């Protein structure tokens, strides 16, 4: 069965720091991460038909991802195994100022993915392709593959969704802004982050950020504001979506969850405002547990939160 949503990027095995035990030492919860993989799982949990495009190493981490996607209903038929390169790994640390990351991704299997590896038939058949700044920032071949995938989808009449997800350790702001701008000019849905816009564009005002990205051509821009909720912009108008107060312990992957849930609802026929309200609730619930994947909520949990907040349909 063809995937309606194809996500493309870098999966990474995750080790997430837990609160210190009685002896003061921290343990690390093994899990799975990578922004577009997180989004793929979030969309699949909301009922979308999802596939993934990447390369994994021929290693236990790669096997773990294949098992995860099988459990979550994410089609991995378009995932290559690269026997020469390993699957990436990262650590999440928690402190008084929030969470921080340490990545081991240099020369990973995903970073060596190139245009000839692309599954053209699957791309032509999908309704939406989702990718991110990380998808392109990990290497030049990966950036080229992303542009080639976008071209294949657009030629077939599909839509493109893009999350900026700027990581300064991957590339300098000027190059990141140039590459992302070229991709976003071909996108229909764009999900910038407040911190990304400040770092790459020098913009802090939410309306100025929406003005910038809508000016590049996308139909819908959703500015992710973290604890501040979200700000939706279209050619017709703008809507602020209030955050949900939750007992947050780990925001890792919350933005990815937002993107996946939003796209799942778009595929289900929702309008942009309804999809953004749903995704905002899903992202809030994700923050109530540790790890990028395990706390991603079910539709029942999301609708229950919306109902409690008086924001249900």
Segments the model singles out, each with a brief description of its role:
Residues 1-74, 247-249, 313:
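Glycine-rich phosphate/adenosyl-contacting loop at the front of the ribokinase-like
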Residues 15, 102, 170, 200, ...:
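Residues that scaffold the ATP/ADP-binding catalytic core of kinase and kinase-like folds
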Residues 43, 193, 255:
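Short, conserved phosphate/pyrophosphate- and ester-handling motifs at nucleotide-, phospho-/glycolipid
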Residues 1-6, 151-152, 202-313:
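Conserved phosphate-binding/catalytic region of the ribokinase-like
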Residues 5-7, 160, 190-191, 221:
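Residue-level marker for buried hydrophobic side chains located in beta-strands
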Residues 128, 134-212, 228-230:
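Conserved beta-alpha-beta core of the PfkB/ribokinase-like small-molecule kinase fold
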Residues 49-133, 304-311:
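Conserved N-terminal subdomain of the carbohydrate kinase-like
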């Amino acid at each position: 069965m063809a995937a309606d949503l194809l996500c493309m990027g870098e999966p990474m095995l995750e080790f997430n720091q837990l609160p210190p035990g009685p002896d003061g030492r921290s343990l690390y919860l093994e899990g799975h991460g990578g922004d577009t993989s997180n989004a793929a799982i979030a969309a699949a949990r909301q009922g979308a038909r999802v596939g993934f495009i990447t390369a994994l190493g021929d290693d236990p981490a790669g096997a773990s991802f294949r098992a995860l996607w099988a459990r979550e209903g994410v089609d991995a038929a378009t995932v290559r195994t690269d026997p020469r390169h390993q699957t990436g790994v990262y650590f999440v640390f928690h402190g008084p100022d929030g969470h921080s990351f340490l990545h081991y991704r240099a020369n990973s299997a995903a970073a060596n993915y190139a245009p000839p590896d692309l599954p053209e038939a699957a791309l032509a058949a999908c309704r939406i392709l989702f990718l991110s700044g990380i998808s392109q920032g990990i290497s030049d071949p990966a950036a080229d593959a992303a542009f080639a995938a976008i071209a294949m989808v657009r030629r077939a009449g599909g839509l493109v969704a893009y999350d900026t997800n700027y990581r300064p350790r991957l590339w300098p702001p000027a190059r990141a802004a140039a590459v992302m701008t070229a991709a976003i000019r071909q996108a229909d849905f764009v999900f910038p982050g407040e911190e990304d816009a400040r770092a790459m564009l020098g913009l802090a005002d939410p309306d100025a950020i929406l003005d910038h990205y809508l000016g590049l051509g996308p139909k819908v821009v959703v500015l992710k504001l973290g604890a501040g909720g979200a700000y939706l912009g279209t050619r017709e108008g703008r809507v602020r979506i209030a955050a949900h107060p939750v007992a947050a312990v780990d925001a890792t992957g919350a933005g990815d969850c937002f993107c996946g849930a939003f796209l799942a609802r778009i595929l289900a026929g929702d309008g942009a405002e309804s999809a953004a309200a749903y995704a905002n609730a899903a992202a809030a619930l994700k923050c109530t547990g540790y790890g990028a994947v395990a706390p991603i909520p079910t539709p029942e949990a999301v609708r229950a939160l919306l109902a409690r907040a008086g924001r249900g349909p």
